[in-house]
Each structure stands twice: as C-alpha cells, then as structure tokens.
C-alpha cells in the first residue's frame, strides 16, 4: 500500500472541548508529521457584502462554511501538495486577505462544529470523532472565548447563544453524532478515550506505510 495521510475528523458543539482533544492528539504525535486544519477558517468570504449585513451572519449554520474550498484543500494535502490556508477575520466578519502556507503532513486533524455534516468531508476521513459535552459547560466556554478572542460583549454572546447557537446545535450539530466512529464524553478530560484514539491512529499509520 502506498503512503497516504491519515485524516481525523473531530466534531462537536461550540465549546465542547474539540480543540482540547485536538491538541491532546497533536501533542502525542508532535515528533511526527502532523497538522491541524480548523473548519472555522473556511467560513465563506463576505467581502462583497456591506458590513451591517455581515453582522447578521449565522456562523452555526452549514451554509456559512465554504466546504468546497475546504475539500479542495484537503484533497491537495492528501496528494502531499502544500496549500495556502485562509484566515478569517471575526471583527470584519469576512475572510482576511492574508493566508498561511501549510505543508502536507502524514496526519491531518480536521476540527470544527460541522465537519461531520457534509458527506463529502466524511468520505475523506479515516476516523470520525464527536466530542460530547453538557450544554452548560459549552456556553461558559463559548462566552469566555468570544469575549477574549473575538471582542464580544457578554450580552451579545448570551443573546446569540439563545437565538442562534442552541437551535443550530440541536438542528445541525447534535444529529451528526450518529456519523461518529467514536463519541468522546468530557472532551479533553477523557484521557482514556484520547489514549485509545492515539493507538488507533498509530495502527492506521502503520497500515499506510508511514510509521
């Protein structure tokens, strides 16, 4: 069998601990060839829209993502070709003109709330994970992130959670759990599940003639 990268999809609600799980797996393979690809960098470019209209963007809906662009980049990485990863500007609510050069690696971790929603993405994955965390923990984590990293107010985060995030989670994110090979409760705190994942990834790497 020829050399082929391993693609791991990590999904779950906003604030579920996906990033913690991703980093835990990444740390286990730090000495190897591994990269992280975040779905939320692939929100659609909205530079053609007035700023006031961009403010109404529903970032928790599947249509907010440019999955065609993400799939194009994944296929490039799977062919061991480099990509120019986009950067999303949450203050301007559109894609930045800047990009990041990313070289291909043997392990690709694709992380995002809806990475399991699109069948085309699922078909590119070797392992599909869903991080399952209680709603109260998810809202607290989302509040802290949006206030610290995205310049949001507490009131705006709470209002958005009630009117958008929660209904979108119930309608689109939670149902993707059924596509997961493994469901990880307690996010990054679940060391047993993460250790099992690391072992499984090592097995696939060996089968793909990488390790």
Curated annotation (Swiss-Prot):
Enzyme Commission number: 2.7.1.48
GO cellular component: cytoplasm
Pathway annotation: Pyrimidine metabolism; CTP biosynthesis via salvage pathway; CTP from cytidine: step 1/3; Pyrimidine metabolism; UMP biosynthesis via salvage pathway; UMP from uridine: step 1/1
Keywords of this entry: ATP-binding, Cytoplasm, Kinase, Nucleotide-binding, Transferase
Molecular function in Gene Ontology: ATP binding; cytidine kinase activity; uridine kinase activity
Source organism phylogeny: Bacteria, Bacillati, Bacillota, Bacilli, Bacillales
Record-given protein name: Uridine kinase
Binding-site positions, ATP: 12-19
Domain of life: Bacteria
SUPFAM superfamilies per the UniProt record, alphabetical: P-loop containing nucleoside triphosphate hydrolases
Species name: Bacillus licheniformis (strain ATCC 14580 / DSM 13 / JCM 2505 / CCUG 7422 / NBRC 12200 / NCIMB 9375 / NCTC 10341 / NRRL NRS-1264 / Gibson 46)
ATP-binding in keyword set: yes
Family per record: Belongs to the uridine kinase family.
A GO BP entry: CTP salvage
Chief location: cytoplasm
Location relative to the cell: Cytoplasm
Catalytic activity: uridine + ATP = UMP + ADP + H(+); cytidine + ATP = CMP + ADP + H(+)
UniProt keyword Nucleotide-binding present: yes
């Amino acid at each position: 069998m020829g050399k082929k990268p391993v693609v791991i999809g990590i999904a779950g609600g906003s604030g579920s601990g996906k990033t913690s799980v991703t980093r835990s797996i990444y740390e286990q393979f730090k000495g190897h060839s591994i990269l992280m690809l975040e779905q939320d960098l692939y929100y659609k470019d909205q530079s053609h829209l007035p700023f006031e209209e961009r403010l109404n963007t529903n970032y928790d809906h599947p249509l907010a993502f440019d999955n065609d662009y993400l799939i194009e980049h994944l296929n490039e990485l799977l062919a061991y070709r480099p990509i120019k990863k986009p950067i999303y500007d949450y203050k301007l609510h559109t894609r930045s003109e800047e990009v990041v050069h990313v070289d291909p690696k043997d392990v690709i971790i694709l992380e995002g709330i809806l990475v399991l929603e699109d069948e085309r993405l699922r078909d590119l994955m070797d392992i599909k994970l869903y991080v399952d965390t209680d709603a109260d923990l998810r809202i607290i984590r989302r509040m802290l992130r949006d206030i610290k990293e995205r310049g949001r107010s507490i009131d705006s985060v709470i209002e958005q959670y009630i009117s958008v995030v929660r209904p979108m989670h119930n309608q689109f994110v939670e149902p993707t759990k059924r596509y997961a090979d493994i469901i990880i409760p307690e996010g990054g705190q679940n060391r047993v599940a993460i250790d099992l994942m690391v072992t499984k990834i090592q097995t696939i790497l060996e089968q793909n003639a990488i390790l």
